[in-house]
Amino acid sequence: MDNNLTSKLKYREAKLGYLMILPLLTVVLVFIILPVMGTFWISLHRDVTFIPEKPFVGLRNYLRVLSAREFWYSTFVTVSFSFVSVSLETILGLSFALILNERLKGRGVLRAIVLIPWAVPTIISARTWELMYNYSYGLFNWILSILGVSPVNWLGTPISAFFAIVIADVWKTTPFMTLLLLAGLQAIPQDLYEAALIDGASMFERFKSITLPLLKPVLIVALILRTIDALRVFDIIYVLTGGGPGGATTSISLLAFNYYNLGDYGIGSAISILTFVLVLSFTIVYLKVGRFRRD
């Protein structure tokens, strides 16, 4: 009798659980799974605007993309941008979070100021940086002219354009890392620090033995979110350089956009699916590394 009652209660709880997550599953199905499946289906066809027929070509679009130098170069640009940007944002975000976690006068105002760049829409932020990078009347070249230094074409060479984009992205997104890591720091019990202080632990020892281990789960989540976002970078590059000079800063998303603009939806969709696979691969690596270190 008791076993039967327990089984019924478990069934009701399971049924309630499924009903609770049903709206979320519906959203995931409609806005994630179906669009990805639709994009994959298009990528299996020669879908070009000026060609009425859309013949099924299988994986031919993928072979064409994978054999193209521009795809691998854009992949290199995207991965390099993600690595440099996320690394800098993590270091700066953790530094700001540690400072804002201290009991400072006016830290509420400081937190609000730090979050301002994140609140600015990316298009507006990128346009502002574009004006500051301008060769003729930009802020940076104006400062150089005061110092007696020749102006620099910040967006005119591949290397300078790459780092110009990185700087703009770091300024925009570091507050996001700061916010996540600050929330993780505030969840760490202060008793641990007080006990370590009594034991004579230095600031570095407290950071190494208490802060980093307890902050690691939040740090991994922050890295996953930022890496996913960085690998999909489009808007800030589109506004600042448009992929130039000479395609030197073209990301994978921008490359797919260019093919869509040309009306080649089959190739554009294939690049989009490969971008999805790239993002998924990095996410799995982060999760595996994080789980291994926790174990």
Curated annotation (Swiss-Prot):
The keyword Transmembrane applies. One of its GO terms (biological process) is transmembrane transport. This is Trehalose/maltose transport system permease protein MalF. It comes from the Archaea. PANTHER family: BLR7065 PROTEIN, INTEGRAL MEMBRANE SUGAR TRANSPORT PROTEIN. Coiled coil: none annotated. InterPro entries: MetI-like, MetI-like_sf. It is found in: Cell membrane. Belongs to the binding-protein-dependent transport system permease family. Its main location: membrane. Keywords: Cell membrane, Membrane, Sugar transport, Transmembrane, Transmembrane helix, Transport. The chain crosses the membrane at residues 16-36, 79-99, 112-132, 146-166, 210-230, 236-256, 267-287. Residues 75-286 form the ABC transmembrane type-1 domain. PROSITE patterns: ABC_TM1 (PS50928). The complex is composed of two ATP-binding proteins (MalK), two transmembrane proteins (MalG and MalF) and a solute-binding protein (MalE). GO terms for cellular component: ATP-binding cassette (ABC) transporter complex.
